[in-house]
Amino acid sequence: MILKYDDIPLVHLPAFKGGEKELAANMFFDGTNRIFRGRLVPGASIGVHTHEDSCEVINVVSGMGVLLEEGMEHEVTAGDCFYCPKGGTHSLRNPSDAQEDLLFLATVCQC
């Protein structure tokens, strides 16, 4: 199956997972798994959450972000990939002093 993000409706998810501002995403959902292109403007974030029954892969396309993984912060930039295993806890934010949007691709699979 080929997915074209530009053909998937853009959704705006305010305070996603308890984060700041909103996550804008072109999100495909097959009833079990999610594949999406996400955008966080400066100051926006995805709140801290745990993947109880899923795992997630995030690939940073452009911009800079701060990833919180199990209580430790890591700077992520274009070309970085993050894997959150089942049971893992994380969040992602675009620092408010950032000059550009944080664009990323993510896949959340049930495992």
Placement of each model-derived feature along the sequence:
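Glycine- and acidic-residue-biased ligand/ion/polar-headgroup-sensing regions
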Residues: 53-65
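Ligand-binding loop in jelly-roll beta-barrel domains
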Residues: 86-111
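A short, N-terminal "cap"/entry segment at the start of jelly-roll beta-barrel domains
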Residues: 1-32, 47
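Short beta-strand segments in beta-sandwich/barrel cores
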Residues: 45-46, 63-68
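Short acidic-glycine-tyrosine-enriched beta hairpin
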Residues: 71-86
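Conserved short histidine dyad/triad with adjacent acidic residue
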Residues: 36-51
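A generic "binding-loop/recognition-motif" signal
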Residues: 42, 53-54, 72, 88-89
